[in-house]
């Protein structure tokens, strides 16, 4: 599993009925009017969505991996869940490293520590200076070392070198962004 990249207003069949059962009111009128105008309702929505994603995706995913004799390694960073809880469910919590924000790894390694996980992995050296096309192909070796050292200091102990090594033969262009 790579990353659960999500957007706002995620919905699925039955979400409204289970929401009403759990919270005691109908969410549909608020969704129609714009849930962001109702902070308390938005909080309930996000709480319910987090439970849906955790119970309906992450837990079954981890169980399936384990049933097949595999480990689950997941980046939960964009997940609409309580990421500390979600990271504690997977076998190998994974972060990613960027020179412009190495501190996020602390959340991942903290969750791993609290749930007795031995490995914390990182998709390392991707988007070193921020997202797409910011100094692309201008990474400096010294910066790679700074990032790796910061990741180790923040509790990451398994680096997956991601990016240039995976480009097709004869190409030095990474176009998946």
PLM features: residue spans?
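Polysaccharide-binding and catalytic clefts of secreted carbohydrate-active enzymes
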Residues: 1-83, 164
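Hydrophobic targeting/anchoring helices
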Residues: 68-177
